[in-house]
Amino acid sequence: MDNIIFFFFKFYLYYIFLYFLGRSFLILISKLSKIKIDSFAKIQGLEIQIFYPVVGIFFLGNYLYLLNYLVPLSHPAAYFSLLFLIVNIYEPLNRAATKNVIINLPFYVIILISSFDINFHYDAGLYHLNNQLWIRESNIVFGLSNIYGPFGVGSIYEYISSFLWVDKTFMLIHFTNIIFVGLLFSFIFINLTRNKNQQLYTGSFLLLLYSIFDNFGLTGGRNGFINIQSIGKQDLPIAVLFLVTSILLLTSIFRNRYKEEEFLLYSILALFIFQLKISGVVISFFYILFLYYYKTEKNITIFKLLSKIKFLIILSLFWLTKSLLQTGCVIFPLESSCITNLSWVNSDYLLNIENVTVNFSNSYYFGESLKIWIETYLEVPTNQTILFNYIISLLTLYIISKIFFINYKNIKKHKILFIIFSASCLFYLRFGPDMRYLSGLMMLGVYSIGINHYPRKNIPIFLVKILLLSSLIMVPKLDSYKSFSLSNVPRVLLPEEKMIERHGRLAPSSGDRCWVNINCSANFENYNIDNSGYFKIVTLKK
């Protein structure tokens, strides 16, 4: 079947699968942790149902990476994840809340238009697709990063994406990103229309305005709001998850109200962010602060608190072990976290990758001239454009907040925000102030303007809906609308790369992209793959 109706049907079928998979996982972990988190639970006034699809993605990714310890993901066992859907029969649906989720589904019709002008990201051909191919063709490979350095920063997204190769058009990978866009707009919409927790209202309204401002400004726009990327990148999911999770954590702290079901969901989302990308570790600043206030308010020890999420801690340990086996480092490519006496570890190789990674992101070395670094950073046109538009957006939204909203000052909240933003900015300054990584923090900065602000007069829901619809329409690029067709179904095709022989294997004849070829690597180093044991071991040749 190859028509537009089936295309939309395929997306909604995928959405429903993730929805009920996420629900299954929460039912299971509720039993394991003895924390009640049923279909009637609310997270800061938000129905738990809006988080089901994202939790489903988290569950699918963790099932797949654990399975990959034993077998390649082309193995039929990868599809056993479908069996977990049976768990749904053990708990009745909250029909009212499910109905509210269905109301939000039309959001995706607009967002799906982005599929008509989508293609592979440069990094997809560089390492993502070949990494996924290795995951599909082999169980966990010791020293995988020796084949090609970027394989070492493998995200949980690689495992999810490799599973989605079942769709030969690669659209399911794009659909996964779209689900995160839907989460963001559902989060904003619910906060502005039916959430009784008014602390989330003003910040959400400012985020909505900010999303519209993204389409105007220097060089036509872009101010740090989410941008639908080409297939193969996971920066958008990280930005959305970071924003939503940090807002929820801060809201719990500021309200001084702590519930076990919220603690459990926050823990899931925080772990997911870290698994998506190592730079997501910044969420730990918010999470640790939340844990401190939670244990203080409930008067329990940190060990008793963490015992409630033993299963998630075990998942974390297996994830770090995976990194250690594939790279020799707990946190790749941080050379100081590597175990150098492992047979597949080469210290010089790791140090070189660490330096390349930090320098590629225009990182700042403390002690060097900040003035020179800023000048160099702003020489990149994208950095200059986004930063300028972001500052203008912030100033405009600040003025709007002063005119149309009342500010109830709270010194404690301001101190917490100052400390946590300072720590986050210093981290990104040192380890990668790339605009792609900063999007979540930039959106949180916009939201923070609205903290402790309440409308002077009620904002008509009709106006909110008009603004939301306008913002949604602007999410797909203009070229996507131009490419939209009722007769052509979106698909992307793998390009063919010319190869040369290097060290007895294949390498790109020009450039550095292998696309999908397990015998290809752009690595100039020579390596050896030992296939004699149950696990393949890759070592660099001297």
Regions found by a protein language model. Give the residues of each.
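Perimembrane helix-loop-helix junctions
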Residues: 86-96, 283-313
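Membrane-embedded, hydrophobic transmembrane alpha-helices
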Residues: 1-97
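Hydrophobic, aromatic-rich transmembrane alpha-helices
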Residues: 20, 24, 180-196, 371-411
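Active-site lumenal/periplasmic loops and adjacent helix-entry segments of GT-C-fold
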Residues: 113-205, 210, 226-229
